Structures are given as structure tokens and as C-alpha cells.
A protein has these predicted regions:
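Hydrophobic core positions of alpha-helical segments in small-molecule transporters
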Residues: 37-38, 200, 246-247, 310-313, ...
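Hydrophobic alpha-helical transmembrane segments of multi-pass membrane transport proteins
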Residues: 44-47, 185-268
Length: 420
């Protein structure tokens, strides 16, 4: 077979792609850092996170009480708060600073602060305030303290309304405090727990973040090992853009296709979270999501000069990305700029789509906007990755003292293969 024939070039390109795949796959399992982020963290971290929030609710959360009012109403507030199943008045402090020290020592998870003018304002018919300070390192304790304080305040407000309503019968009092009777029935998150609300989004975010960490760390290793400190080594097997992009992408797709099914199907079942996922829907959904994450990571890998840099670029973005999806913070309250900025990341549409699939039993037709957005991101980031790797390939050739004519000839040959 002539080396100049199109068939030979295609076969040679496929062979080089398989060689790159084999090399990258071997590096994933030999590099301890990449192995940890691409294999061990996706396997272990979801189990730890799910175990923490498996109970859905916590009981008897320790709370410090700062009562500067010392009135009948403030004592009623504290008594009702302590009688609730979710919170417990553990310490009584004389000042807010004393209560803060207890929070710093982890003796309590929150503070109830009742100011000195609390009862005075109530007697004047003015609005009184009760301060609630919560430790947000664990959302379950924050939820228990905040909702308990809110419930007690609503109960006291009802008593004040009854006393000022002037009703003659119990029915009059009921109408005063609750003019419209309603039953609150949770439709999807039946446990009204933090795990069912947030965990699906966290699982999908873990896929993206660990993938970015793994790809970035592998890119940093490549630069450190290559003699010219370039992302792409000078080798006959790394002679074309498509073979490099597809060879690298195949590695992470094979790994994360398995991990994606593990995170979306196995982990929720292990811990009894609400999961209405079907095989066909999740397979169709994970395909564009994993591909968009891969090409997004490969595109950003050109920014990584050293292995440690990727930690600074990725880790600190996890919490903001989760907030910008709108599952833990109302999407309607997110400014338009940040909503537009969140569209850059595949996790935004991935989390929104998977949450509807997992909690609401949605099909691909029901999440069509997110599904289309992921495919658009896949196409855009694939083209961007090809452009970035083309520039990296030319830079590596020139630094290796290859003439511009040789580089141009190889590029023309690659274009023939690509057009064929």
C-alpha cells in the first residue's frame, strides 16, 4: 500500500490514535495523582458525602441561648425552642461573645440571640427581632436551628394575633391566625431532606470536577516530562490534531462512562435516596454531559503549566458552581450576568437535567433545553480543543527545530485525512 494513498493515511491515523489512547491510559493508572482524582475520588467521595447526609434530618442540635430580655415572652420562646425535636437549648450565655466562643469550640452549632428590648417592642405593638446565628459547615444543623426558630416565632406571632384580634370564639381565633387552611404535601422530595435535594447535583458536579482535576494534572505531568515543556510531545504518533484529541478523549470517556453510571445509579440506591432514573434516559443524558466535560477539560489543559496549578483552577470553583445551578439558591435570584457565566460550565445543565431525571422521573424530552445545551457545549468545546491542540502542536514542532515547511506539510497531510 502506497504511503501517499488516502487509505494508508486513514489507517495510520487510527493506529496513532490507538497508540495515544494506550499511552494516556497507562499514564492514568501509573500517575498516582491522576489515579486518585480520576478513580479513587469518584469512587470514595460520593460514599462519604452520602453517608453524612443519609439521615436526612438531625435531632437535638446543641444551641447557645443569649437572653438579654429576661421577660415572659423570651422565656416562652426559649421553652418552645427547647421542646422541639430538632433543636436543644444547651447553654445559656450572658453575652454574644461568650456564645461565639462555644461555636468556635464546636460545643454548639448555633446561637439564639434575644435583645434586651424584645419584650418592650412587643408591648408597644412594634416589630421585635430575634437573632439566629448558625454554623453552616453542615447544612443539616443549619436547617434544624433555622426552621425551629422560625416555627417558634410563627407560633408566638399567632398568639399575639389572637390577643389583638378581639375574637369571641375559638373559631374566630382560628380564622385570625389561619384564614386559609392548607395541607402541605411534598411531591418529589418526599422526605423534605437535604440529601434528596442536593445530593444529585453534587454527584454530577463530582464527575466534572474530578475529570478537570485529572485531565489538568495529566497535562501538567506531560509538560514536566517533555523536553520542550510543551503539552504535546514531538513524536510521529502525535502528528495530527484529530488523532490526539480522540485518543485522549477515549481514555476519559471509557473511565467516566463507568463512573457516571456508578454515581447516578448505584450510589443513590445504596443510601436509599429518591431515584426515578431509568437506564435509557441516563445513558442518553450522560453521553453529551461526559463528552462536554472531556472536551472542556482538554481545552483548559493548555492553561496548566505545573501539576499543582490545576488545584488552584478547579477546587475553589466547586461551591460557586453548585450555587449557580439554582438547586441550592433560587435561580430567579441569581443576577443575569452570573446566570450567563454559569452556561460556560457543563455542570450547570448537567445538574439541572439530572435533578429532574432523578427526583421527578423526567425523560429526555422533558429536559430538552438542558439536553440540547450539553450537545452544543460538546460541539463548541470540541472545536475549541482542536484549535488549542493545533496551536500546541505547531509550537511543539517549532521548538523542536522543525522547519515551518515541514510543519506545514504535516498539517496539509492531516487536513487531507480529516477531509477524507
Amino acid at each position: 500500500m502506497l504511503k501517499s494513498s488516502l487509505l494508508y493515511k486513514i489507517i495510520n491515523g487510527i493506529w496513532d490514535m490507538c497508540y495515544i489512547w494506550k499511552t494516556e491510559m497507562r499514564n492514568v493508572f501509573r500517575d498516582e495523582g491522576v489515579l486518585i482524582f480520576c478513580i479513587l475520588v469518584p469512587l470514595g467521595y460520593p460514599l462519604l458525602y452520602s453517608w453524612i447526609y443519609n439521615n436526612e434530618v438531625v435531632r437535638e442540635v446543641d444551641t447557645a441561648i443569649v437572653d438579654l430580655s429576661h421577660s415572659h415572652t423570651s422565656r416562652e420562646f426559649i421553652r418552645d425552642y427547647d421542646a422541639s425535636p430538632d433543636a436543644k437549648a444547651t447553654y445559656y450565655c450572658n453575652s454574644l461573645d461568650e456564645a461565639k466562643q462555644l461555636v468556635q469550640k464546636q460545643a454548639v452549632h448555633g446561637i439564639i440571640y434575644i435583645p434586651s428590648d424584645f419584650d418592650t417592642k412587643l408591648n408597644r405593638g412594634e416589630q421585635a427581632h430575634v437573632g439566629v446565628y448558625c454554623d453552616m459547615s453542615l447544612m443539616l444543623t443549619y436547617k434544624a436551628i433555622y426552621q425551629t426558630a422560625q416555627g417558634v416565632a410563627s407560633h408566638i406571632n399567632s398568639g399575639i394575633q389572637i390577643s389583638k384580634g378581639g375574637g369571641f370564639t375559638d373559631r374566630d381565633d382560628e380564622i385570625t391566625t389561619e384564614p386559609l387552611a392548607f395541607d402541605e404535601v411534598p411531591i418529589f422530595n418526599t422526605t423534605v431532606g437535604y440529601g434528596n435535594a442536593i445530593l444529585p447535583g453534587v454527584l454530577v458536579l463530582i464527575l466534572q470536577q474530578t475529570m478537570l482535576l485529572g485531565i489538568g494534572m495529566a497535562a501538567g505531568t506531560s509538560r514536566e516530562l517533555n523536553r520542550n515543556r510543551e503539552l504535546i510531545p514531538v513524536s510521529k504518533h502525535y502528528g495530527g490534531i484529530f488523532r490526539i484529541v480522540f485518543g485522549k478523549a477515549m481514555v476519559y470517556f471509557m473511565v467516566y462512562a463507568v463512573l457516571g453510571m456508578y454515581l447516578t445509579l448505584v450510589v443513590p440506591k445504596l443510601f436509599g435516596f429518591v431515584s426515578m432514573v431509568t437506564w435509557t434516559t441516563i445513558l442518553g443524558f450522560l453521553l453529551p454531559y461526559i463528552l462536554s466535560c472531556i472536551f472542556f477539560g482538554l481545552m483548559l489543559s493548555c492553561l496548566v503549566r505545573y501539576r499543582e496549578n490545576v488545584m488552584l483552577l478547579v477546587v475553589f470553583t466547586s461551591v460557586p458552581l453548585l450555587f449557580m445551578t439554582g438547586i441550592s439558591w433560587p435561580q430567579s435570584n441569581i443576577p443575569g450576568f452570573w446566570q450567563g457565566f454559569s452556561w460556560v460550565f457543563p455542570s450547570t445543565f448537567g445538574i439541572r437535567g439530572f435533578l429532574r431525571i432523578s427526583s421527578m422521573g423526567a425523560s429526555l424530552a422533558d429536559i430538552l433545553p438542558e439536553f440540547r445545551a450539553l450537545w452544543i457545549q460538546t460541539g463548541v468545546y470540541f472545536l475549541a480543543t482542536c484549535l488549542v491542540f493545533r496551536q500546541q502542536l505547531r509550537s511543539a514542532r517549532l521548538k523542536a527545530n522543525l522547519t515551518a515547511e515541514v510543519a506545514e506539510e504535516e498539517d496539509e497531510a492531516e487536513e487531507i485525512v480529516e477531509n477524507g
